[in-house]
Amino acid sequence: MYAVVVTGGKQYKVAEGDVLFVEKLTADVDSTVELDNVLLVGKDNGETVVGKPMVEGAKVTAKVLAQGKAKKVVVFKYKPKKDYRKKQGHRQPYTKIQIEKINA
């Protein structure tokens, strides 16, 4: 069984046991979160349930494995011949989750 869920403005195709990195969730490590924005559920018998826009009564349960920050991305702007240089770094926060159960 698999599902397509929406979290952090992005869509993820998930199955039970998958580990993925999503945009930061406000949850503690080793706690469980419920993702109830489910767009699609594919069952083992080949049946697919598509939501309009969400599947009614479907939710995905996941365990929070870690909270962290991604590698630094360096943004460097400059204007030639004008002595203008600007260096900026950004580290995007993320949450590492493991999918435990898909309820549909």
Curated annotation (Swiss-Prot):
One Pfam family matching this protein: Ribosomal_L21p
Keyword DNA damage: no
CC per GO annotation: cytoplasm; ribonucleoprotein complex; ribosome
Keyword Transferase set for record: no
SUPFAM superfamilies recorded: L21p-like
Transmembrane spans: none
GO biological process terms, semicolon-separated: translation
Family: Belongs to the bacterial ribosomal protein bL21 family.
Quaternary structure (record): Part of the 50S ribosomal subunit. Contacts protein L20.
Stated name of the protein: Large ribosomal subunit protein bL21
Organism: Clostridium botulinum (strain Langeland / NCTC 10281 / Type F)
Chain's gene name: rplU
